[in-house]
Each structure stands twice: as C-alpha cells, then as structure tokens.
Amino acid sequence: MKIPKERRTYCPNCRKHTVHEVLESKRRKASELKWGQRQFRRVTAGYRGYPRPLPSGNKPVKKLDLRLKCKECGKSHIKKKSFRAGRVEYVA
C-alpha cells in the first residue's frame, strides 16, 4: 500500500490545518485497566469458562498505526483510524 510521506491535516495543538509528516509506529499492547478487560476478568474468574466462542486462527497482518507529526509545532498525534496492511511504501 502506498502512503504519502506528507499530508495536510488538522493539528489539535495548533488548532488549524497544517502539513504533517507521516511516521509509522508499532501498536502497543492494549491497557489491562480498560473497562472491557476488567469485565472480561470478572466474567472468567472462578470456575466459569470462556464467555464467548474462542477466536480461531491468526490475522494475516498486524494493524498499522500512523503517527502524524506537525511541521509547525513539532507535536505528533496518532491518526484515529488504523488499518491492516501487509506492505507499506511511503511515497513523496
């Protein structure tokens, strides 16, 4: 998949549309303290089994997190929607 190296998008720090540099970052492990994970631990505690059908098979590729770094202020933020991509190529 081809992704442009720079894009003009909204910067929450500057509060306006500016040119951003597109960087790739690895997805971090999901937080164990989120409500869903706490609920899951509560449901599976004790002698109870798994509450839903077991997920079968592995996903073919990992999800990609794009980090956008503002050229004006230098702050970076993550693009909200992440997606799966096998090969990523950054195009000028």
UniProtKB/Swiss-Prot annotation:
Keywords: Metal-binding, Ribonucleoprotein, Ribosomal protein, RNA-binding, rRNA-binding, Zinc, Zinc-finger. A zinc finger (C4-type) spans 11-73. Gene3D superfamilies: 3.10.450.80. GO terms for cellular component: ribonucleoprotein complex; ribosome. InterPro entries: Ribosomal_eL44 (IPR000552), Ribosomal_LSU_eL42 (IPR053708), Ribosomal_zn-bd (IPR011332). Pfam families: Ribosomal_L44 (PF00935). Binds 1 zinc ion per subunit. SUPFAM superfamilies: Zn-binding ribosomal proteins. Zn(2+) binds at residues 11, 14, 70, 73. GO terms for molecular function: large ribosomal subunit rRNA binding; structural constituent of ribosome; zinc ion binding. Its cofactor is Zn(2+). One of its GO terms (biological process) is translation. Belongs to the eukaryotic ribosomal protein eL42 family. Binds to the 23S rRNA. PANTHER family: 60S RIBOSOMAL PROTEIN L36A/L44. NCBIfam families: PRK05767.1 (NF004425). Part of the 50S ribosomal subunit. This is Large ribosomal subunit protein eL42.
